[in-house]
Every structure is written in C-alpha cells, then in structure tokens.
Regions:
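N-terminal glycine-rich beta->alpha transition that marks the start or flank
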Residues: 18-70
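Residue-level marker of beta-strand positions
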Residues: 34, 69, 88-89, 99, ...
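A glycine-/small-residue-rich N-terminal strand-loop-strand element
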Residues: 69-93
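A structural motif shared across PLP-dependent enzymes of the aminotransferase-like
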Residues: 93-104
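Mid-domain Rossmann-like dinucleotide-binding core that forms the NAD(H)/NADP(H) cofactor-binding site
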Residues: 115-193
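Glycine-rich cofactor phosphate-binding loops and adjacent beta1-alpha1 units
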Residues: 178, 183-261
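C-terminal substrate-binding/catalytic core of Rossmann-like NAD(P)-dependent dehydrogenases/reductases
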Residues: 198, 202, 206, 247-299, ...
Length: 333
C-alpha cells in the first residue's frame, strides 16, 4: 500500500492512499525513508501566496502534490537493470510519498557513511548550485547572502568550498545565523537588511560586496540589495517570490551598472557540464564525505507523514525560525 501527501485546498494537507504504476523491466520500486519540506516552494503552494498571472498561478492547482527531495531504499528491481540492487539507498526528485516507481536515470546512490538527514539536502543543494553557476563567481569576491533558510544555508556551504574572500550573512534569526557560521559564513549580522547596510559595509572593512545572493523570496529585499552591492556588482535572485510586482528597482541599477540575474532549479538543464543533475548530487555527496560541506544538524523538526497538516502549519507559523523540516516515512508500517 502506498501513501502520499496532498494539498487538497488552501492550507489543507492530508496523507492519502495512492495507486502506484506497475513495475516494468526498466524501473525500480523505492520505499521512502525521509523527505525534506522546501519551506519556500511548498509554503507558497500551501498558502496560495502568489499573484494572479505568475508562473505560480498556472502551476499550483489543487489537488497539488508537494515535495521534491526524498531519500529512499530500493525494494524491487526491474529485470533489465543490472547496476542497482535491493537495499541500495538512493535519492530521488519526487513528491512526498511512501513509495515511488522510477527509472534508473532518476536516482543517485547515497554513500554508506552519509545519514538520511544529511543526504536529504541533495535537491536544495542542487538549487543553490544553480545559483552559483548563474553568479559566475570570481576568485576573491566578497559575497553577501540574504536569508538563511534552507536555500540560504546551502548557498553559504557552496561558497565556503570556493575561493571567496569573505561571506557575510544577514538574517533576523540568531539560530539560523549560528547554523550559517557552522557552514562557513565569515560574518553574520542579525536584523533586517534595510537596517543593516552600514553594518555589512563595516564588517567588510569599508567595502561593499561584489556579489549578493537573495535567498528570501521577500519582494522588499531587492531594492535594499541594490543599495548594498558595489558598483558594477551582481545580485543573484534565488528566492522565487510569489509577488514579483512588489519587487522594485532603484536608480542604483543604471547609475552604478549593477547586474541582476535570476537563478532557478531548471537552469542547469542543457548545461554542457551539469545538465545531468546527478553529477551535482554526486559532487554534493563527495563534499559531504570529505567534510568540506556539512548538512549535519540542519534538520530541526521531524514529523510522521500522518502529521502533514501540523507540519505545514508549523512551517507557516514559524517561518523564518525553523531549519529543515523532515517527514520520517519509517513511521508508516
């Protein structure tokens, strides 16, 4: 028997029985172990928090299947598949559900030394990686990361593996800032960006950052990021707001020659080196195994999938304060 989490309407999440497709000679049956809530994407869909006419408006239709980051174990192997076996632990981009039938090309293998709670960040790490590709990061750059939710935490950790000179992180929540420091941030500043621009410049020795990552999905951030970034600097928008009409440009854009680039999960498609996202997952696992990238202790809340409504209401009410929120599928027997 298979179960999946479904948004049946605005702010309504349930666990319901689901019908699986038949196993074919070229597919795998997976049993989920853990799946991570994307508190940005999924809360936008859960609360129907977006403008009419946006891509959100055309995508989010109820019933809606949330989720895209699952750690699972192989339960059955199609007869034509030779390089996977029952018991192998894998990751898959799939909605929150107890079981999945997938092709071999949809999975990446998890090294034994990496726990489920570390591995489950693979998809969020991939999205952050797309942001770094869009940034065309320069050696020695001073970088500011605005927002240290799950996505911002991944950006900080990727930056820490590069030759950036300084990584300053701005967020209202001290606990999230502490996690960012563990992930490699060189400076952390608590508060709202509009009140902390001078503090950022001071921390950077009187310099403005050459590069800013906006990981907030808060439309008010862009105008203040434009004030903060250096002349001819770059702003990468990773947080996908549901209210783009509320994002405002300032005269800094033209007068100071600033570049703004959007980065999205799908932007690695067609990339000559990273078009197969499994290569990014494998790199992520290599860095986890070597200790150069850590996702340990980033999960702060764990839920039985039968508590889906409770999980999303908590994520909504404590937005900006939680770390990773995880569904533990071992609770379903």
């Amino acid at each position: 028997m298979s179960f999946r989490i479904v948004f049946t309407g605005v702010r309504q999440a349930i666990l319901q029985e689901a019908q699986l497709p038949a196993l074919t000679p070229n597919s795998l049956l997976l049993r989920s172990r853990a799946s991570l809530i994307s508190t940005g994407t999924e809360l936008t869909a859960f609360g129907h928090r977006f403008e009419r006419g946006t891509h959100w408006d055309s995508w989010v239709k109820y019933p809606f299947l949330p989720g895209y980051a699952t750690v699972a174990q192989i339960e059955k192997v199609g007869k034509n598949i030779r390089d996977a076996k029952v018991g192998d632990r894998v990751v898959v981009r799939a909605p929150h559900a107890s079981h999945h039938v997938v092709k071999k090309t949809q999975i990446a293998f998890v090294p034994d030394a990496i726990s489920d709670e570390e591995a489950v960040w693979f998809a969020m790490a991939k999205i952050a990686f797309a942001g770094l590709l869009a940034a065309n990061l320069q050696t020695g750059a001073r970088v500011a990361v605005i927002g240290t939710g799950p996505l911002g935490q991944m950006v900080v950790r990727w930056l820490a593996t590069t030759a950036t000179s300084e990584i300053v992180v701005i967020d209202r929540n001290e606990k999230r800032l502490a996690l960012a420091r563990k992930g490699g941030a060189t400076h952390t500043i608590a508060g709202a960006l509009e009140e902390k621009i001078d503090s950022v410049v001071k921390r950077l020795g009187g310099h403005r950052p050459e590069l800013i990552f906006d990981c907030t999905a808060n439309p008010s951030v862009l105008a203040n990021a434009l004030r903060l970034v250096t002349d001819r600097g770059k702003i990468v928008i990773l947080g996908d707001t549901g209210f783009p009409a509320e994002q405002h440009l300032t005269s800094d854009l033209v007068l100071r020659g600033i570049s703004i680039v959007g980065a999205h999960d799908l932007h690695t498609q067609g990339d000559p080196e990273w078009g197969d996202e499994r290569k990014i997952f494998d790199l992520f696992f290599q860095l986890l195994s070597s200790g150069r990238f850590s996702t340990a202790n980033l999960v702060t809340h764990r839920f039985d999938p039968r508590q889906a409504q409770e999980a999303y209401l908590l994520a909504e009410s404590a937005k900006g304060k939680t770390g990773g929120i995880l569904f533990d599928w071992s609770k379903l027997k």
